[in-house]
């Protein structure tokens, strides 16, 4: 009895061993995970279906001599029913045995497919030229409302002003922290630029006053010097020095001071105050 039980247990265990059953028409020739017991059951079903089909052909041949029309009508109906059952069984069997996505592709393959899909979607997106033009117009005409503009749009506008090829698609690949750092850098640059502009205007005014003083004394050759020394030349020659001077003096970025110095610079160049 003990030997019989051990043999039965061994046979049962063998029924649950996995087999390598594959189908050539299945994508990537993936294997079905079937046990020996399941494979034996499928073979038995195949034998039964083949036997029933053979018996049907024999019955049709035998009944042809007695009542051909009646047999054909009745047997055709049963044959269609039998075929329908067979098709339904095969379809349901295929559906149940279809492996999941995790079984077909590993994690690296799925990540690669997702990256390809994202790249294709980005190619289909419209270019940001219209947005860049609109932002440029809005930025230049409404400087007081710069705070409500999108940070990415401000970065694009700054890149456009400096003739740097940059699009919204390039910024979408950046993280929020990187966008924040670029925005802060641009904001700090504008603050320093405004402070440096105050020192530049003061230098232009001093040059105009000194020019008029020297012309009044008798140095006519110096006339027109203030027109030659433009803000661009000052920024190119001593721009960094003006920036350091503005920082050390603690010059504040005051719009009133900027406007006043700008107007004073224009009038001094046109009017002889000495």
UniProtKB/Swiss-Prot annotation:
Entries under InterPro entries matching the protein: Poxvirus_A11
Tagged with keyword Coiled coil: yes
Protein name: Protein A11 homolog
Quaternary structure and partners: Homomultimer. Interacts with A32.
Glycosyltransferase among keywords: no
Compartment(s): Host cytoplasm
Cellular component aspect of the GO annotation: host cell cytoplasm
Pfam families: Pox_A11 (PF05061)
Modification note: Phosphorylated by a F10-independent mechanism.
Family statement: Belongs to the poxviridae A11 family.
Coiled-coil annotated spans: 106-136
Induction annotation: Expressed in the late phase of the viral replicative cycle.
Disulphide-bridged cysteine pairs: none
UniProt KW keywords: Coiled coil, Host cytoplasm, Late protein, Phosphoprotein
Function: Required for viral crescent formation early during virus morphogenesis.
